[in-house]
Amino acid sequence: MTETARVSETASGIQVVTEVVPSVRSVALGLWVRTGSRDETPAQAGVSHFLEHLLFKGTPNYSAIEISERFDGLGASFNAATSKETTHLYARFLDEHTDEVFDLLGEMLLESTFPDIDSERDVVLEEIAMYEDEPSDRVHDYLADAIFGDTPLGRRILGKADVIANIPVPDIAAYHRSRYTADNIVVAAAGNLDHDAIVAMAEKLKPEPLPEGVSHSLEPVHPSMNGRLEFATKDTEQYHICIGGPGIDRSDERRFVMAVLDSIFGGSSSSRLFREVRENRGLAYSVGSYSEQFTDTGVAAIYVGTREDNVEEACSVIGAELDTIRTSPVSEDELLRAKEHVKGRLVLSGESTAARMGRIARATLHDLPLLTLDEMIARVDAVSVGEISELASELYGSERLSLACVGRDED
């Protein structure tokens, strides 16, 4: 556990985790729910994200404009986000306004009246349409489909336009009642705060009890261990390409090895992919590797955007780099540089109360240990050349890698 982090549980079962940062005069507060697009059926595709929008539209005490005016009047910045496994409302504000901001976020989370739903449908449909016009974003969804197929992890967070256009209010309200329950909620805060005071505020939250017969257990997802091809035809200047396969889950102790491997391979401006594809050959402006971790699986992937004339060479270079990282040990210089890069990001993010809040929230939501900064740095320092080689060999085998592409012509 971090030196200043504390975890408590309210009488209703809500978990509360806080981290005191006495050197600041602000607080970052998040109300997190263990629900996202992974928890949807095909008939609900996109309801988690749509519901996130609707939480801002009105409560018994505030209209949508009054919610915005209230936050502005408290000098707060606020927003919300939905992922495949979580949804959360969050705000940053002066510490003197903690009570008021907490009450407002709590009312939005649990007492939304879902007014003006049709106008917000149109907003979300426009967001989906905008996303469709961004091939550099959409290609990651096609890769997820190739890896996870017709499972919740294979579907996009925004969902399907026909579902959003037609899903009725009672179905949205039922989803809210079944997912926004005490056992699924974590209150997280970081900044100049008092833990016991935050717990007292959380005690006032009154989520619905878990409906009879409803379970929050996750259905296991079994990613494809055989590579697949997904191609989407679109009139684009560049071809947007993702290559990737199943990765490690978020509880895997090798997540620190993965962070260092990513830095070496494609996660920094001195990485192998950046140097070879962009700097040495000029084949792309944007190229890199990335990883995602979920409860029981993950993704390890590469992205490149390049013009049609460069597609073949870019893919050939990336293939060669995949072979090299998988079969040849990295140098000690590369390893040291990557470790310092990862540690630097950890330390710099620790200077943000919002980043600290998000880190302790995710750890609590997913039953992970709350590591101190020194503990995380020690785990990065402990990564060895052998561990990098072993993980790269496991994740980057050609037989398990899928390819997704958005471009003009599949041939």
Q: In which residue ranges do the predicted regions lie?
A:
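Short, cationic low-complexity segments
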Residues: 270
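Charge-rich, well-structured scaffold segments of protease-associated domains
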Residues: 3, 9, 20, 64-214, ...
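Flexible, small-/acidic-enriched active-site or ligand-binding loops
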Residues: 228
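C-terminal active-site subregion of NodB/CE4 polysaccharide deacetylases
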Residues: 224
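Active/ligand-binding-proximal structured segments within catalytic/core domains
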Residues: 13, 20-71, 180, 253-265, ...
